[in-house]
């Protein structure tokens, strides 16, 4: 059956803008707020009640509705949960709403089916400079429709995998916050820090560009984790490093963001990678000491970047009494657990999709 035949409505969001009103409790999502299969309210705009009500007449977001990004980055999806914010949320035209007819189709079954066909949905999009998915093409997308009891059974299994993935994500956030708290206690709030010296990063670490000849075009479906200037976002059939290191986004909007890399990994064009070569500090200490793009010397305005020379010359506090090494010993199990959770999520996502 066509998607339009099993849905009450398939449309997009507001064609135009809304007036901001901080604290109103009425939300205006854009495509950037649809990711990791959730509606992300962390940086969402709040708008006036009047603008919300006007747009809500068109979108009428309810629990069980599916949101799909249809412009720019095509195909990111989320299912609206039974949350008090859901009924106070509308969205821009870069987001489409798929409102299932629950007499015919289970919302979660439809969501997971569309998720499994993500590459086909993306291929429907046209445009050269800015990809756009036409609502007409989306409405004609073919959906197999087993009996409702079978739909519910499939959705229940897949939903349990998603729940485990989300649990691992929350655990990783908690572990990261714990590592940051330990770092703050040992190095930021330490009254002895005034007597510590500094060294250039290049004096205590191996600092070099990532593979400038490799881009995302080389990514494969499965393999060894690869870091771009946006973070760990793909796989390569080989690995360049088998060491704990730090990957720095060196060119573009994310310049100054860092990620800890463990196990076997690579980093591609527009990145700088480094790891400790000193007995005084651990790589885990370096990732925390360099965390935050405000700490890095950014050049350029339209296109921010960090030069390799500037990265090597960046000054790093070097604590006394081997504290930076002790910190590595303390937090290494936390980072290892985070890496394990991430790998487990990869396997769970493959089972689900």
Model-derived segments and spans:
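Low-complexity, Lys/Gly-biased intrinsically disordered segments
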Residues: 1-40, 49-56, 189, 194-239, ...
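Non-catalytic DNA-recognition/assembly elements of restriction-modification systems
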Residues: 1-13, 140-228, 317, 321-353
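Alpha-helix initiation and N-capping motif
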Residues: 107, 118, 179-180, 198, ...
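A short glycine-rich beta-alpha junction/loop motif
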Residues: 1, 87-94, 127-155, 265-271, ...
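A short beta-sheet element
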Residues: 30-31, 50-115, 228-312
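Well-ordered mid-protein domain cores that form the structural environment of catalytic cofactors
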Residues: 115-116, 123, 144
């Amino acid at each position: 059956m066509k998607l339009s035949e099993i849905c009450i409505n398939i449309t997009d969001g507001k064609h135009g803008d809304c007036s901001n009103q901080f604290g109103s409790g009425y939300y205006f999502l854009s495509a950037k707020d649809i990711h990791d299969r959730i509606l992300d309210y962390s940086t969402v705009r709040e708008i006036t009640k009047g603008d919300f009500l006007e747009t809500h007449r068109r979108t009428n977001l309810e629990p069980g509705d599916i949101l799909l990004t249809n412009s720019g980055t095509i195909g990111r999806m989320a299912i609206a949960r039974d949350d008090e914010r859901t009924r106070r949320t509308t969205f821009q035209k870069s987001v489409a709403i798929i409102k299932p007819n629950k007499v015919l189709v289970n919302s979660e079954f439809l969501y997971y089916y569309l998720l499994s066909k993500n590459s086909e949905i993306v291929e429907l999009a046209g445009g050269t400079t800015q990809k756009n998915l036409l609502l007409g093409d989306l409405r004609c997308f073919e959906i197999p429709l087993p009996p409702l009891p079978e739909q519910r059974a499939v959705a229940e299994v897949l939903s349990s995998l998603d729940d485990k993935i989300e649990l691992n994500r929350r655990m990783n956030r908690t572990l990261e916050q714990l590592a940051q708290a330990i770092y703050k206690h040992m190095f930021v709030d330490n009254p002895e820090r005034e007597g510590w010296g500094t060294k250039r990063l290049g004096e205590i670490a191996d600092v070099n560009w990532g593979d400038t000849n490799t881009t995302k075009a080389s990514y494969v479906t499965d393999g060894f984790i690869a870091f771009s200037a946006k973070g760990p976002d793909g796989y390569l059939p080989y690995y360049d490093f088998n060491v704990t290191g730090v990957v720095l986004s060196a060119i573009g909007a994310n310049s100054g963001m860092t990620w800890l890399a463990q196990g076997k990994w690579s980093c591609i064009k527009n990145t700088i990678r480094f790891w400790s070569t000193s007995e005084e500090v651990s790589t885990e200490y370096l990732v925390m000491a360099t965390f935050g793009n405000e700490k890095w010397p950014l050049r350029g305005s339209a296109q921010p970047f960090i030069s390799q020379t500037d990265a090597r010359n960046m000054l790093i506090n070097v604590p006394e009494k081997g504290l930076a090494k002790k910190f590595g010993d303390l937090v290494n199990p936390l980072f290892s657990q985070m890496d394990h959770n991430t790998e487990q999520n990869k396997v769970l996502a493959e089972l689900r999709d």
